[in-house]
């Protein structure tokens, strides 16, 4: 839903937001459902969105099950600097794709944190954690799996967005 097919998947998204309590997949109560968009397995949310939007914005097509082998994602998308100078330095196509990625990230967490059910997030998701497109980092260098605290500082606006959504959920 977040990275494409919005109109085709709106009914499924509504059912998910309501924790599948009404309809053919009724699970009972919201507390029985974990809502998430990324976990420690597979791509991080940021990497998945980079792959999806790089494909759509840069001219190729998004394959089913996007991963690092299906889309050639420019490294600059993973390392994105969202300052005006940073976006100006990557060219208009990549800057547009990065803006779409950030908007989709916010939509994804907005859906997760305002949905019925128990929210779950990958550590570092709040600052656009990346494993640079690696969908299976189990045997990778430890630096790939570490949390990048410099990135957290650089993406503090996104952290603030997550914090506001968490506060809204608590209220």
Residue ranges and their predicted role:
Residues 1-121, 127:
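Conserved alpha/beta catalytic core and glycan-binding cleft of carbohydrate-active enzymes
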Residues 171:
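A glycine-rich beta-turn/hairpin centered on an aromatic-Pro dipeptide
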Residues 1-28, 127-164, 168:
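Active-site-proximal helices and loops of the catalytic beta/alpha 8
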């Amino acid at each position: 839903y977040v990275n494409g097919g919005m109109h085709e998947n709106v009914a499924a998204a509504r059912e998910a937001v309501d924790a599948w309590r009404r309809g053919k997949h009724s699970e009972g109560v919201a507390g029985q459902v974990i809502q998430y968009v990324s976990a420690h397995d597979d791509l991080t949310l940021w990497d998945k969105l980079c792959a999806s939007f790089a494909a759509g914005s840069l001219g190729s097509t998004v394959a089913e099950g996007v991963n690092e082998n299906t889309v050639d994602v420019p490294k600059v998308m993973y390392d994105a600097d969202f300052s005006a100078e940073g976006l100006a330095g990557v060219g208009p196509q990549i800057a547009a794709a990065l803006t779409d990625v950030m908007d989709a990230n916010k939509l994804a967490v907005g859906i997760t944190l305002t949905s019925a059910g128990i929210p779950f997030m990958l550590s570092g998701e709040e600052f656009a954690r990346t494993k640079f497109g690696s969908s299976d980092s189990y045997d990778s260098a430890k630096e790939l799996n570490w949390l990048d605290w410099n990135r957290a500082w650089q993406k503090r606006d996104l952290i603030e967005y997550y914090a506001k959504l968490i506060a809204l959920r608590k209220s």
